Amino acid sequence: MKKMIMIALVFALSGCAELQQMANQYPQLGTLGNADIAAGLKEALNNGITKQVSKLTATDGFYKNQAVKILLPAELQKVDKALRGIGLSSLADEGLKVLNRAAEDAVKEATPIFVSAVKNMTFTDAKNILMGSDNSATTYLQGSTTTALYSKFNPVVKNSLGKVGADKVWANIITKYNAIPLTTDVNPDLNDYVTDKALEGVFKMVAVEEKDIRTNLSARTSDLLKKVFAMQDKK
């Protein structure tokens, strides 16, 4: 009889330990309201923006990150090939690098605009996003802010292209290419192209952080994040 009691006690204590572990991992799970959910998602997004976008603004943040590196548009790929074919590889390399430098510079100045867009999320949006897919928050931001961000981002990119000398480098490249016999003249809008790619890179890196916080418990660095994302763990 004593043996049976001891076995039951062991199981009971084991169960209590597991419950305590869950309680520590998911504190106050039952106390969440819409305001908590919205606050948690906004915290997660702001963390993602701060962490991932800061990587993009560093030197070579775009240029040496294969996930977001800005390559030449289709119209200019033939320019790149032609220049390399006549011994101007260094000029072609510089042309690619300055496009990425412009994006790195532009993202640094545009980030506060992007962060402010997070504040517009409603309670209903937050709850739907929380229980959605691994990139629901990023998709929501893309759909609700891209147009506004683009209109703000584009002039920053234009200024940045001028600041890093990309406009002059590419004016020189295009002039040399257009002077090659039997080629069709090109005149691409690099401002729009770099803006598109810079925004694409920002959203891609935010999506990386969103997936991480949804799937990696150690990425939930506050009690609020632990509580909020514990809900989606159980869906």
For each of these PLM feature ranges, what is it?
Residues A198-K235:
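A cross-kingdom marker for long, charged
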Residues V156-L199:
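An amphipathic alpha-helical core segment
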Residues A17-Q20:
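Bacterial signal peptide processing site
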Residues S90-S160:
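Mid-length scaffold segments of soluble, non-membrane domains
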